[in-house]
């Protein structure tokens, strides 16, 4: 009779549960089984665990659920040694919830999934009672390293902002945060044995020896993390199953350090005439023993602060040409039998790796660091330059993080007219989502050495964003972060972009609740038979503006017009927004003939004629001084609705007139001042007359570089 009862219960359970498509959980779990009934979360419920290790996690979940944590309760967190690391089992029953994990990370992953089953307000202020459909979830990640790198050097990002971003990563099961703490622009971590590194090196501009870059040209600006700050970030992230990995970028990208300690540089005197005495060298001399003494102090303190296994020591974009001019480096190369400076870099990295080993740490490096010779076998290599470099690292036997820029650099543009870089690629979420190691050409043996994926956000273009774009970090990284989370978690050699897009749209309500100012896909704009319309499929509201009358409103119905180019559309929902969408005529630009002249001599190869051809940069042969000017004179006066005249690179404000003003001439003879430059450029909106010439005048000495870049003008016609 007892056996019959057990069988009946088993049949009932099988009838009560069924495998169905998961309810838009990102990343997608291995198995989601829907069951009959629901769990009703009440204020009287408790998150419970008997494990001291899991109590911080119980408190974390209880805070999100608006309940208390205790050793007994209705939502139970447990360790299960039969499960692997980060593996979990989640059971939602009518009377209780059980989350079991193979370790702390596994239980956390179950908690993150459980939160995605609750109403979206769980991420801000969950109202009780709340219901969750009964279900069973079995899940584990494909890769143990699911990372994101945040550059806090080019743009200072506060401790509080980092911790807020940690939450966003944790909600999506990203488990590594690499902080890019040192670079040419700043030194962000307190080193108590050398306090000047952060106290001076954390700031640039003003009376700082570090030249201003990427914005904030006229003020001393920045900050740094005390060791107490960093320990607070580490502890906060640890509760959320995120390991914080520091990067101290060596031996290159060290201009900030060199600005404070020029003695670290190679033993030769460069020509500084073109930079008004500012030394732009950025690489540690590899031959000076005093440098290794300084770095030993730094490494010791970094290892004491961070509890991670790996310390990233850089190795990218080292200007080894400086070593070729250094008598000490050349002598060391001869002594060691080296013929290439890349071998000297490997020597440098091995010495730093030996220091790390003394403190029980292992080195992590950028892919260039393995080009010049063998590094320790336990080195973790981050392949950023391309797929080829990732495959080479794995083939050499190094554990490898796959992060080629054309798929994983989230500072890249998402379409050609949006802000960001474009040197690696222009891509949105779909390109990242499409990545599999098989599709990238990794062999079975190479795949064995891939331990995960990482995306990155280098922040050069962040500091100069205008106030209305203060959420640039969110916009650039979401929803691309959802793609990263998915491919780093799910074991699959095929991708269904349409299905995942539908998952993302369902997930947008959660991004809204998290307060993420993510990027929406632009509305689809159609003009047929004199009727202009716009469509969106993501639940957003579409807004339309007539750029001639400057009247904007919510788009509700198609527009009958003979001038479709006068209308521009954007989509918004919550804090999210899309790029502009319009018929192609709206984006059309003019390319009138012009002559470029300057008080500064032109570069020998990047001549002024390059800019006159449009689409290419010109350069001067020296940096700028007070009173220097650049003039654009048009063959015929240009009538337009907008004209942008800019110094600097196309994608970010570097090699610019840091301070200055613009003058306009309508007759080619008389110039009038129209305003100050912003980040090296001036934009003329609706000029009252056709423009014959524009002149940019510099009002500050130098720009931290050896030249000024000059862009061709961008000119929009009247509509």
How would you name each of these model-derived features?
Residues 83-310, 351, 355, 454-461:
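Feature activates predominantly on carbohydrate-active enzymes
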Residues 583-640, 646-659, 676, 707, ...:
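Disordered, acidic Ser/Thr/Pro-rich linker "stalks" and the adjacent N-terminal cap
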Residues 363-368, 375-379, 385-533:
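Flexible, acidic glycine-rich loops studded with aromatic residues
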Residues 696-704:
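Short beta-strand-plus-loop segments that form exposed binding edges in beta-rich domains
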Residues 502-619:
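Low-complexity, disordered linker/stalk regions enriched in Pro/Thr/Ser/Gly
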Residues 19-141, 364-370, 509-513, 600-601:
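Acidic, contiguous N-terminal accessory segments
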């Amino acid at each position: 009779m007892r056996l019959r009862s057990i069988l009946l219960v088993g049949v009932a359970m099988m009838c009560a549960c069924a495998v169905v498509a998961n309810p838009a959980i990102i990343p997608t779990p291995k198995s989601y089984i829907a069951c009959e009934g629901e769990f009703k979360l009440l204020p009287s419920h408790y998150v419970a665990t008997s494990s001291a290790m899991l109590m911080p996690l119980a408190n974390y979940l209880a805070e999100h659920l608006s309940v208390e944590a205790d050793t007994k309760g209705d939502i139970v967190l447990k360790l299960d040694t039969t499960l692997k690391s980060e593996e979990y089992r989640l059971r939602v029953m009518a009377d209780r919830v059980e989350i079991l994990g193979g370790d702390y990370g596994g239980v956390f992953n179950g908690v993150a999934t459980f939160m995605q089953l609750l109403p979206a307000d769980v991420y801000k202020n969950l109202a009780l009672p709340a219901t969750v459909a009964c279900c069973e979830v079995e899940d584990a990640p494909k890769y143990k390293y699911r990372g994101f790198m945040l550059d806090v050097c080019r743009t200072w990002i506060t401790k509080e902002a980092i911790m807020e971003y940690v939450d966003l990563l944790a909600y999506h099961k990203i488990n590594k945060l690499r902080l890019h703490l040192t670079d040419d622009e700043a030194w962000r971590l307190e080193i108590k044995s050398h306090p000047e590194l952060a106290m001076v090196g954390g700031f640039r501009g003003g009376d700082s020896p570090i030249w201003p870059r990427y914005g904030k040209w006229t003020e001393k600006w920045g900050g740094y993390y005390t060791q107490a700050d960093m320990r607070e970030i580490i502890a906060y992230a640890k509760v959320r199953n995120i390991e914080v990995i520091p990067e101290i970028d060596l031996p290159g990208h060290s201009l900030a350090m060199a600005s404070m300690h020029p003695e670290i540089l190679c033993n030769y005197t460069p020509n500084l005439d073109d930079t008004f005495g500012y030394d732009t060298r950025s690489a540690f001399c590899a031959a000076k023993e005093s440098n290794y003494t300084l770095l030993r102090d730094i490494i010791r303190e970094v290892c004491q602060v961070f509890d991670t296994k790996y310390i990233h020591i850089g190795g990218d974009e080292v200007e080894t040409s400086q070593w070729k001019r250094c008598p000490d480096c050349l002598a060391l190369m001869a002594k060691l039998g080296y013929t290439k400076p890349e071998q000297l870099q490997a020597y440098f990295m091995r010495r730093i790796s030996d220091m790390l080993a003394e403190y029980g740490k292992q080195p992590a490096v950028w892919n260039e660091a393995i080009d010049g010779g063998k590094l320790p076998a336990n080195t973790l290599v981050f392949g950023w330059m391309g797929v080829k470099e990732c495959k080479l690292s794995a083939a050499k036997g190094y554990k490898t993080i796959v992060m080629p820029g054309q798929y994983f650099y989230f500072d890249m543009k998402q379409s050609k007219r949006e802000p960001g870089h474009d040197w690696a690629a222009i891509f949105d979420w779909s390109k990242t989502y499409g990545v599999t190691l098989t599709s990238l050409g990794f062999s079975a043996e190479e795949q064995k050495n891939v331990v995960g994926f990482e995306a990155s956000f280098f922040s050069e273009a962040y500091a100069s964003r205008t106030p209305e774009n203060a959420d640039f970090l969110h916009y650039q990284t979401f929803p691309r972060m959802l793609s990263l989370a998915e491919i780093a978690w799910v074991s699959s050699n095929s991708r269904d972009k349409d299905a995942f897009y539908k998952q993302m749209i369902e997930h947008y309500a959660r991004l809204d609740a998290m307060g993420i100012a993510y990027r929406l896909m632009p509305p689809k704009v159609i003009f047929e038979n004199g009727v202009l319309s716009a469509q969106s499929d993501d639940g957003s509201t579409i807004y339309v503006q007539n750029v001639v009358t400057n009247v904007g409103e919510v788009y509700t119905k198609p527009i009958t017009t003979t001038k479709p180019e006068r209308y521009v559309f954007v989509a918004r929902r919550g804090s999210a927004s899309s790029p502009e969408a319009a018929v192609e005529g709206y984006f059309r630009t003019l390319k009138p003939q012009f002559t470029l002249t300057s008080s500064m001599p032109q570069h020998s190869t990047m001549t002024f004629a390059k800019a006159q051809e449009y689409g290419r940069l010109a350069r001067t042969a020296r940096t700028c001084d007070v009173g220097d000017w650049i003039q654009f004179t048009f063959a015929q006066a240009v009538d337009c609705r907008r004209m942008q005249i800019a110094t600097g690179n196309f994608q970010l404000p570097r090699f610019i007139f840091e301070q200055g003003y613009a003058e306009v001439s309508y007759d080619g003879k008389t110039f009038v001042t129209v305003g100050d430059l912003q980040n090296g450029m001036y934009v003329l909106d609706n000029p009252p007359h056709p423009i014959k010439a524009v002149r940019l005048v510099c009002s500050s000495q130098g720009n931290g570089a050896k030249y000024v870049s000059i862009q061709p003008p961008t000119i929009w016609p009247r509509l």
